Amino acid sequence: MSIVARKEKQKQEIRSLILEESMKLFVEEGFSKVSVRKIAERVQYSPTTLYLYFKDKNEILFYCCESGFEKMLEHNIALGLISDPIERLHQMGVNYLNFGLENPEYYDLMFIQEAPMAALIEMGAGWSSGDQALEALKMIVQDAMDKGLLVPAK
């Protein structure tokens, strides 16, 4: 392995460690009670080192949630193989519940705590994988409506 490749691998490992431990802290203590200094203590790096990887605590939160949505999307890859939109919708619900049970930290950060939305607004950003998850749901519902299996409320 070349020096450049080894350094890049080390950089990704540190970044992953920061995200993993930050997520645990956000869930344990709440986003507002966690500081970059506290995250740095947890990962045993200086706060300055964390700023080499992330702009601020909000950016750390953003990438924690983005990672969660990516994991959630992985649960839904096989949905396209189900032709019946009602069955697809049902399976998406099952996948959502299983995701929450298998990944309680991600679930709490993504859907329970208010901090992610505030961080998104402050950053002026959006979650591409979160948007994809919502779009998949909308497409299933629209397919069911197109086939007359779901009727809009009047």
Identify the role of each PLM range.
Residues 60-68, 76, 110, 118:
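Alpha-helical DNA-contacting segments of helix-turn-helix folds
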Residues 102-121:
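Amphipathic alpha-helical segments used for helix-helix packing
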Residues 14, 57, 64, 68, ...:
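Hydrophobic/aromatic residues within well-ordered alpha-helical segments
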Residues 77, 121-147:
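Amphipathic alpha-helical packing segments from all-alpha helical-bundle domains
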Residues 28-32, 103, 147:
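Short coil/turn segments at alpha/beta junctions that flank glycine-rich nucleotide-binding fingerprints
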Residues 63, 77-106:
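Hydrophobic alpha-helical connector segments
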